[in-house]
A protein has these predicted regions:
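Short helix/strand-capping turn motifs
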Residues: 1-102
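C-terminal charged interaction modules
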Residues: 92-125
């Protein structure tokens, strides 16, 4: 099996399509990506900070720096663009990943979106 389908993108438990920021040119919002196997139940969850350059600029007005891991930076809020970019990245990863191991594939996705098991180390007794 390989995670190969975006099942849902949501913001705070609500569908991305139902969310709209106060300022579409200056916002940041964590979205949850539910990624699973097409035609099967279940998903693995990843989090991604979607933000604009203007939001980053305003953060820099009050801070010396802004860290940038697990971010998708877009010019203005656009649900279709967000969905398209997330799907495009998943397809790019599917094309270069030849294995069939969901754990290893999740580690690849985690380079772009935070995965709850990222850096998890199993402790044997």
């Amino acid at each position: 099996m390989k995670l190969n389908e975006i099942k849902q993108i949501d913001v705070g438990g609500d569908l991305l399509a139902n969310y709209w920021p106060e300022d579409e040119y200056c916002f940041s919002e964590w979205v949850t990506l539910s990624i699973g196997v097409k035609g099967e139940e279940g998903s693995t969850y990843f989090n991604l900070l979607v933000c604009t350059p203007e939001w980053i600029s305003r953060k820099l007005d009050s801070a010396q720096s802004v860290w940038g891991r697990h971010m998708l930076i877009i010019r203005k809020y656009d649900t279709e663009l967000i969905e398209s970019e997330v799907n495009k990245k998943l397809q790019e990863l599917l094309e270069i990943f030849t294995g069939d191991d969901d754990l290893k594939f999740s580690e690849k996705i985690a380079r772009y979106a935070h995965w709850e098991y990222e850096d998890y180390v199993s402790k044997s007794l």
